[in-house]
Structures are given as C-alpha cells and as structure tokens.
Amino acid sequence: MNKLSKRLEVVASYIKDNSKIIDIGCDHGLLSIYLAKKYNNIKIIASDVNKNALGTAINNIKKENLEDKIETRLGNGLDIVNSDEIDTIVIAGMGANTIIGILKYNTDKLVNVKTIVIQSNTDLYFLRKNMIKLGYYIEDESLVEDSNIIYTVIKFSKGKKRYSYKKLYLGPILMSKDNDLFKKKCTKEIKTITMILSRIEKGHLLYKLKLKRNLRILKNRFTC
C-alpha cells in the first residue's frame, strides 16, 4: 500500500474517531484506508465518479481486509448518501467551485453534518465565503508543503461566525499562526498577482481592482 502523502496526512489529522464519513472523490482510497486503520469506531463511505479509480480503491480495501469499515459507492458528490449516514465530509484535491457546487446541490444532506474537511488550492476566498453561507465556521486551518507545492487544508464546523474580507482571503487561523510557511505562501501570491497585473490587457476593471485589493492586503500584512 502506498504511503499517505503529507497533504492527506494533514487532512486525516482533522478527523476524529466515532465519525460517519463520506470521502468524496476518494480516488484510490488511500485516505479512507488510513483512517480505517487508525480508528476503531469509524464508518466510511468512499465514493468517486470515476469507475476505474473506484475499482482500484475497492481492490486496495480488499487487500487490507477493511470491507467491514469502508463501503464504496460510485456516484457524484452527495447524491449517493442519505443524510442519516454521515456526520463528516472530506473533499480533497478538487477546485473550490466544484466543492461548493457539490455541497449546495444537496444542502438537505448536510442536516447531520457537523464537520467538513476540505483541501483545495483554488480561490480560497470563494471557498471560505460560501462555506460560511452554508452555515459553517472555520475551526482550524493548516498549510503543508508537499513536492514543492503549498496546500491549504481547512476544517469547517457547523455554526455561525462573521469574518472580514481580509480574513476570508488570508484565512483567520492561518493569520493567527503566522508561521514561515504562511509567509512563503504570501510571498508567492504577491509575485503571482504582480505578474498578472503587469500582463493583463486593458479593460477587466473589476478583476484588476480585486487583484490590487488582494495585493494591498498581502503587502500590508507582511514585509516580503
């Protein structure tokens, strides 16, 4: 069995025993298998829309003799579960738009869901903002560097909190941790935004204003 990546190790660290989990987009099932081995009283539904990927997951689960802890299902998002089957959702490796689309399409399935753990590297402001709208707050966040890529992992819990634009953009918990990896991530974002602004064509006024706002936030927060 392949070793769990650093990225998925951080995702796994946010999961507790006695949880009823759906691992959406489980791919080869490595995260589900890791959790099933780690905890005694955990129930996992490993799902994927890709038949071949799920087939590999099924084989991996059988090799580890974990069929009693992990059930596999082929299908899209939350379509393949009932609300009483889950209290925790894990989604790792998808874009923010796709993730929010999955959750918004089946809001009735979230009634018993207390925890949602997400790893996404696209438009984290959009992700955080829409998770707040869905009735979840940011309980914890972590950064992890794996193969020279800095990944963001966020644990959302059911409840209400308000956040400023700055906190939704940078991440309120990441700001409070203020570690070297966060500064490195911000330095990279400053360089990326500066490059985009230098190359962007005339017009696109709203997009430019958004980029400039984000750049000001990054520069005012850190000396890079």
Regions found by a protein language model. Give the residues of each.
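Conserved class I S-adenosyl-L-methionine
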Residues: 18-27
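Conserved SAM/SAH-binding beta-strand->alpha-helix loop
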Residues: 50-52
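Glycine-rich SAM-binding Motif I of class I
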Residues: 29, 33
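Gly/Ala-rich phosphate-binding loop of Rossmann-like dinucleotide-binding domains
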Residues: 36-37
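Conserved SAM-binding motif I beta-strand of class I
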Residues: 43-48
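Short SAM/SAH-binding signature in class I
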Residues: 85-93
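S-adenosyl-L-methionine
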Residues: 55-84
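Class I S-adenosyl-L-methionine
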Residues: 2-10, 79, 85, 97-224
